[in-house]
Amino acid sequence: MNDRELMFLPAHEQKRLIVEKVISSVEMVEASYRRIAELEPQLNAFITLDEDGAMSAARSADAQLAQGKNPGVLHGVPIAVKDLEVTKGLRTTLGSTFFKNWIPDYDSVAVQRIRATGAVIIGKTNTPEFGNREETFTDIAATCNNPWDPTRMPGGSSGGTASAIAAGMCSIGTGSDGGGSVRLPASFCGIFGHKPTHGRIPRYGGQAKPAYNSAGTSGPMSNDVRDSAILNQALSGFDDRDPGSIKGAVPDYLIDLENGIDGMRIGTTMTLGISDVNDDVATAVEDSWFAFSELGANVENLAIAFDPMPREAWWTLWTAGQEAMYGHLADERPEDLMPYTLEMIEHGRTLSGADVSVALRNVQNLQLQLHQVFQEYDLILAPTNAAVAWPHLQPPEKIGSEINQDDMAGINYGAIPFTMVFNSSFNPASSIPCGFGEGGMPVGLQIIGGYDDDATVLRASRAFEQARPWSGDRPPVS
């Protein structure tokens, strides 16, 4: 088996080969780095690599097996970590010039739990500054490219992880999702990404700093649904350093993963009552809905109308959080912040306490509206994005019949209107490949579940993956 074939194996298969001593962790990690050496110059998926640290961890993983110790769920498997997660002893830039030399002395909760799985961290992946854009560009690293077409963006803000996995540099990684930042690049790059129920994965040391953040959570990304379910299981669980994390036992995301969706009630919507979509996206998404009917689900059109629209509340809380977390940097050296970050901070400074209170009230109303929807349905199906990946900094001028909106610090809201809803509502949501659109670029289907029902989202994703296999599709740069 060559390096490419190894890196396109599911992570749980890589782990099996390592545990059965068909291949060592050292050999698996070496294969990953050879792939990175070959492909990274075209994709810029990583900000920092840690070959010495990774090889040391791989040798330790092999030694533990030789000593008869029980392996972790991802024992010896190479994994990419988004550079918004704090990593002890490994440079953590947050995509910002301000942190270009920061080497933390602690791990985030997510990274602690990754290490506990036995996975080997190979490096920190590319991200826009503080995760603030749907494209992955920043002053700290070269612009990240999409392996399906390197002249196009991979999405953001977890664009580096998505690009690395899609190209076969590794099979699994982490992202974080504050407005779609796992699901958007998963869709644009043709991989699977899951945004968990908020609070399932503690945020300490990750995207959320000590300020109110209604939006952000870490999440798994992979070429295989089971891999993401395994990682989601490993990362979930209460930690008292994040009082917002959910107490009590973590649901088992694997026990019913293969049990299909027969009898489930599913509502489909092409617009979520929010925005039009481009024809190529609509064609692929609508075709995917038939698979759910064929699998025995009761599928019907869902008419939904949010009141008020979710966009403004999300934008208010996001920019208020940016000002609270990073406003002091704008006071110190505004020239060293990316323009999009500075614009968010400046908008945050225009907000009053009443503005934030109204936004919080509207988020609660949104949560109640969706709670009512999920009394009738087990799942919602919708597009992940309204358009496929576009050339760098050249978003489509129109989405369907509507002018594309880009008045949120350059964020092209009209092309990505469907994800941030479920950040504000806290619902679990995945993006899974469902076809191809303009230019042969991937299209993603968003699968949304009721609050704390990640298990059903992952189960439905697995059923769709089996009915419409996609992981054999490989991009030109791979």
Write out the residue ranges for each language-model feature:
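Structural helix-boundary/capping segments
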Residues: 38, 116, 166-269, 275, ...
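An N-terminal boundary/leader segment
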Residues: 1-55, 294-296, 473-478
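Acyltransferase
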Residues: 22, 27-30, 59-62, 252-255, ...
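Short, well-ordered beta-strand elements within core beta-sheets of diverse protein domains
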Residues: 14-20, 99-103, 216-223, 346-351, ...
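Short helix-loop capping/hinge segments that flank enzyme active sites or metal/cofactor-binding pockets
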Residues: 74-94, 255-270, 317-371, 384-388, ...
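Long amphipathic alpha-helix in the N-terminal Rossmann-like dinucleotide-binding domain
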Residues: 52-62, 117-119, 128
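Short glycine/serine-rich loop/turn segments
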Residues: 74-218, 222, 243, 271, ...
